[in-house]
């Protein structure tokens, strides 16, 4: 009798994806972040579901319903902070996952890569709408500022913004629809994740050397299942440490003040994981230019397969490209820092220089260095 694992129509899909999947023998801990992102998504959907049971998406009661969750619901404070800080862990894993893809040339699987970029956009949209739901000061003003950016679109901009708002300002209609979208998007993300994995399993995983690993594969289970479990334990440890010791470390104190359209906070800024893009947006004095730069700062990831000039796939054996890659990482840290600072000297000029450097490295410096390294191989 053949094993049910290999014959049952449903179970065999799971078997081919997580058990008998041939995996390269040399993939490092940088390959753990895919599974960690899966765990983050599950945590977010579950905690979000329980929060939605007690939350009300009405401007009059939204803020007090969140207070009610934290004060009166059994372990409501835990669920709420796991959800809020789970988003931070999600983005940490996302950035590391994308960084791994850039470093090791995983973007040459361009269907997988492009679905990944779409996923990044979807997660960012979900996180933005989720931040609006508690209806604190930063929720309200963040929603106002970010949705207002669409008014920079020529001709249809203002109409589009009012259509998204459902009125002439961010109000009840906006909150209700944001809650609806925030609820549905994670399920769309889950479907996209399945497509992402489908395309990945068409080609198999990349590995640190960037070389074809068909001649040396090992089964995913038990080798990488046990490795993933270690990663998951560390992720949960980090998340629960954050939740139980300093749950408000990454939040904004302004969001503990109920939304007031008549009182603008002194510094409107998004959550930390959007600060790099926010800094790029602010570094251009023109509204439409800023919005384009903001979108391009993420969309530029789709250009990496086209901009790959090296004869080698991975950066493992390319010290000059490695150096530029880490300068790019440092630049992103700089942009994140600038995004959280007020718009004044010297932060304005630092932000502008960091923004120029960001696009320069990706569009010009990395491809040029790759071509130079190709020449070095001949000498």
From Swiss-Prot:
GO molecular function, one term: ubiquinol-cytochrome-c reductase activity
Xref: PROSITE patterns: CYTB_CTER, CYTB_NTER
Residues reported in the UniProt entry to bind a ubiquinone: 201
GO CC term, one of those recorded: respiratory chain complex III
Cofactor detail note: Binds 2 heme b groups non-covalently.
SUPFAM superfamilies: a domain/subunit of cytochrome bc1 complex (Ubiquinol-cytochrome c reductase), Transmembrane di-heme cytochromes
Matching InterPro entries: Cyt_b/b6_C, Cyt_b/b6_C_sf, Cyt_b/b6_N, Cytb/b6-like_sf, Cytochrome_b, Cytochrome_b_C_euk/bac, Cytochrome_b_N_euk/bac, Di-haem_cyt_TM
Other comments on record: Heme 1 (or BL or b562) is low-potential and absorbs at about 562 nm, and heme 2 (or BH or b566) is high-potential and absorbs at about 566 nm.
Protein name: Cytochrome b
The species this protein was found in: Tamias rufus
Gene that this polypeptide is encoded by: MT-CYB
């Amino acid at each position: 009798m053949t094993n049910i694992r290999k014959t049952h129509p449903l179970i065999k899909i799971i078997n081919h994806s997580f058990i008998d999947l041939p995996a390269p023998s040399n993939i490092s801990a940088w390959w753990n972040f895919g599974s960690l992102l899966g765990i983050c998504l599950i945590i977010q959907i579950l905690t979000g579901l329980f929060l939605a049971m007690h939350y009300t998406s009405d401007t009059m009661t939204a803020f007090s319903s969140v207070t009610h969750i934290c004060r009166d619901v059994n372990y409501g404070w835990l669920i709420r902070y796991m959800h809020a800080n789970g988003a931070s862990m999600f983005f940490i894993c996302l950035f590391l996952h994308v960084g791994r893809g850039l470093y090791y040339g995983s973007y040459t699987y361009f269907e997988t890569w492009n679905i990944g970029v779409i996923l990044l956009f979807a997660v960012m949209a979900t996180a933005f709408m989720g931040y609006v739901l508690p209806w604190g000061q930063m929720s309200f003003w963040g929603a106002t500022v970010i949705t207002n950016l669409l008014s920079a679109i020529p001709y249809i901009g203002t109409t589009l913004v009012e259509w998204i708002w459902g009125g002439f300002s961010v109000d009840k209609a906006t909150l209700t629809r944001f809650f609806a979208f925030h609820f549905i998007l994670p399920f769309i993300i889950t479907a996209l994740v399945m497509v992402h994995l489908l395309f990945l399993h068409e080609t198999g995983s990349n590995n640190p050397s960037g070389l074809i690993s068909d001649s040396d594969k090992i089964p995913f289970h038990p080798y990488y299942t046990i490795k993933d479990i270690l990663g998951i334990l560390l992720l949960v440890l980090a998340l629960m440490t954050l939740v139980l010791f300093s749950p408000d470390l990454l939040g904004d104190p302004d969001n503990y003040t109920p939304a007031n359209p008549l009182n603008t906070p002194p510094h409107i800024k998004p959550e930390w994981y959007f600060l790099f893009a926010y800094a790029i947006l602010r570094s251009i004095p023109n509204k439409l230019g800023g919005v384009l730069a903001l979108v391009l700062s993420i969309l530029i990831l789709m250009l990496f397969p086209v901009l790959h000039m090296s004869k080698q796939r991975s950066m493992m054996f390319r010290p000059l490209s490695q150096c530029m890659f880490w300068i790019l990482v440092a630049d992103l840290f700089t942009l994140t820092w600038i995004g959280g600072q007020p718009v004044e000297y010297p932060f304005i000029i630092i932000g502008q220089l960091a923004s120029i450097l960001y696009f320069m490295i990706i569009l010009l410096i990395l491809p040029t260095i790759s071509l130079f390294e190709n020449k070095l191989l001949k000498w």
